């Protein structure tokens, strides 16, 4: 298992390994806007081309992976940002009662794209149908689109200094011609450049501890608590409190001396890293003070600070005199926090490894620096393989994902090296449907459309005698009742598992315990019978003894 980094510049695209020196270039790749590249599972890479109404599709896995363009998808107009809404990891077959894993050729449910004017497109990828177009999603260009909570919600940010949270079902609903956002955040005063969502997520926003971090050119970082969005019960119970059930709660605001371009969070939500024109800085969200005291910066300090949140100012450690714990306590009392400088460069994009130990920093010179967070040392620098470094431009997209080493530990297999099948001239026969330009009329019930979808392999072999709740609920209840009675049996249960021909044969000692119980019951019955017989014999003996004693007395 290794990690690969995918980054694009104004004139090139590169795929490299984080822990090795393997590297390849993507052909005919040109981007000018950030977040214009999105990875579709572990198979495809979508890149919106600069100054062209076109999406280039690259194949990154299997025996068909290539450096050249796999497929081109024409668009109604030029797109700036891309995002996909993935399918769930397991699909349930109601007829067979079997869970199916996702197949190799698996397309996401939705593809979202934005334009320079703030228009939002929503396509269904399995059919290519244009489900909806939101003409004025933002007043200006959208800077980022992200789906959260398994695609239930969509978050967009734009140059109009707003962050909008949408519900996915509203965007794709055929009966909703003009979808309304769930909430709008307009605390920033300049364009919002980036945002990140915490890793602590659940099924719905109202029952999770999801936090949203937004950064802007106004040199501020704002953290919101999204757990109160859409909570109607809390809204009715607290009608006087405007912070409940309507908009996210602003937990904290961090001000910096520089305009912020990018932000990335630690996988465990312990720290955040921001990229500016003056370098990359790290901020610990669990701030350490004198001794062993640690302060949670995202915890509300009181009732009066719920609406506006706490405000902190970030200062560099090297600008302090000494930088000891006593200075940190004094600065914290004044609302100032000390942040570490990771790298001095003009940062354009940031990304972090899956274990949170490495920080990938993309700059305006077209280079990606891999830095160790603990030591703040540059491990290696990745550049585009080209002869003219001056024309590369800045890093516009930066992605990381794990992958398995296959085919002799080759990261990427070029078109000339790969052993392609003899059929179809070595090309993948599974193609992505073309994206339509006209909105699908969902109100016409007789208007049907085809969806090409491949079903994966069953997740596991199921026992035919095993009742499922969707098939036979009464039988399922009886089965659960039997299992509960077995596991609640008095005494310890010791199981012996034997593996024969890759099949598990489990024999439990419950049967032997039941046999022992029957023997004990039978023994108790026998003992009672013997006791009763003994009492009768004793009574007879006492009577005979009394008669014998009387006969002796008469003599």
Curated annotation (Swiss-Prot):
SMART domains: WD40. GO terms for molecular function: chromatin binding. SUPFAM superfamilies: WD40 repeat-like. GO terms for biological process: DNA-templated DNA replication; pre-replicative complex assembly involved in nuclear cell cycle DNA replication; regulation of DNA-templated DNA replication initiation; ribosomal large subunit assembly; rRNA processing. The keyword Nucleus applies. The keyword rRNA processing applies. WD repeats lie at residues 29-68, 90-133, 137-176, 187-234, 255-296, 342-383. Signal peptide: none annotated. Belongs to the WD repeat IPI3/WDR18 family. Component of the RIX1 complex required for processing of ITS2 sequences from 35S pre-rRNA. The coiled-coil motif forms a homodimeric contact and facilitates RIX1 complex oligomerization. This is Pre-rRNA-processing protein IPI3. It comes from Saccharomyces cerevisiae (strain ATCC 204508 / S288c).
């Amino acid at each position: 298992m290794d990690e690969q980094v995918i980054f694009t510049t104004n004139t090139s695209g590169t795929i490299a390994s984080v822990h090795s020196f393997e590297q390849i270039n993507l052909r005919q790749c040109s981007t000018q806007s950030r977040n214009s590249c999105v990875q579709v599972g572990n198979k495809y890479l979508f890149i919106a081309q600069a100054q062209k109404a076109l999406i280039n599709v690259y194949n990154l896995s299997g025996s068909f992976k290539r450096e050249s363009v796999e497929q081109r998808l024409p668009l109604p107009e030029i797109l700036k940002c891309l995002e996909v809404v993935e399918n769930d990891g397991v699909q349930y077959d109601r007829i067979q009662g079997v869970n199916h894993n996702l197949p190799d050729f698996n397309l996401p449910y939705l593809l979202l794209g934005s334009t320079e004017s703030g228009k939002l497109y929503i396509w269904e990828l399995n059919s290519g149908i244009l489900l909806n177009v939101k003409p004025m999603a933002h007043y200006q260009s959208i800077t980022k689109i992200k789906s959260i909570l398994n695609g239930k919600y969509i978050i967009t940010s734009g140059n109009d200094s707003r962050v909008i949270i949408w519900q996915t079902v509203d965007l794709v609903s055929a009966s909703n011609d003009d979808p309304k956002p769930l909430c709008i955040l307009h605390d920033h005063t300049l364009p919002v450049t980036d945002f990140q969502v915490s890793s602590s997520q659940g099924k719905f926003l109202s029952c999770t501890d999801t936090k949203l971090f937004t950064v802007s050119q106004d040199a501020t970082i704002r953290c919101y608590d999204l757990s109160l969005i859409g909570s109607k019960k809390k809204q009715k119970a607290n009608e006087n409190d405007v912070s409940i059930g309507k908009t996210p709660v602003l937990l904290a605001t961090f001000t910096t001396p520089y305009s912020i371009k990018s932000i990335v969070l630690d996988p465990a939500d312990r720290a955040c890293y921001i990229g500016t024109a003056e370098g990359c800085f790290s901020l610990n969200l669990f701030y350490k003070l004198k001794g062993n005291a640690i302060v949670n910066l995202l915890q509300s300090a009181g009732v009066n600070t719920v609406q506006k949140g706490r405000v902190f100012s970030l200062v560099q450690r090297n600008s302090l005199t000494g930088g000891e714990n006593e200075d940190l306590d004094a600065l914290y009392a004044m609302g100032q926090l000390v942040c570490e400088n990771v790298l001095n460069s003009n940062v354009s994009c940031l990304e972090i490894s899956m274990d949170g130990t490495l920080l990938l920093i993309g700059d305006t010179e077209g280079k990606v620096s891999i830095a160790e967070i603990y030591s703040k040392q540059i491990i290696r620098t990745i550049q585009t393989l080209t002869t003219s470094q001056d024309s590369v431009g800045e890093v516009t997209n930066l992605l990381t994902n794990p992958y398995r080493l296959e085919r002799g530990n080759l990261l990427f297999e070029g078109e000339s090296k790969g052993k392609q099948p003899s059929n179809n001239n070595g090309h993948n026969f599974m193609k992505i449907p073309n994206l339509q330009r006209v909105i699908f009329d969902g109100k016409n019930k007789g208007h049907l459309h085809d969806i090409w979808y491949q079903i994966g392999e069953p997740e596991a072999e199921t026992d035919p005698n095993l009742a499922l709740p969707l098939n036979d609920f009464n039988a399922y209840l009886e089965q659960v009742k039997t299992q509960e009675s077995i596991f609640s049996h008095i005494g310890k249960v010791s199981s012996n598992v034997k593996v024969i021909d890759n099949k598990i044969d489990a024999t439990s000692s419950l049967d032997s315990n039941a046999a022992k119980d029957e023997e004990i019951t039978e023994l108790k019955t026998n003992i009672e019978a013997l006791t009763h017989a003994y009492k009768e014999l004793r009574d007879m003996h006492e009577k005979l003894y009394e008669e014998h004693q009387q006969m002796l007395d008469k003599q």
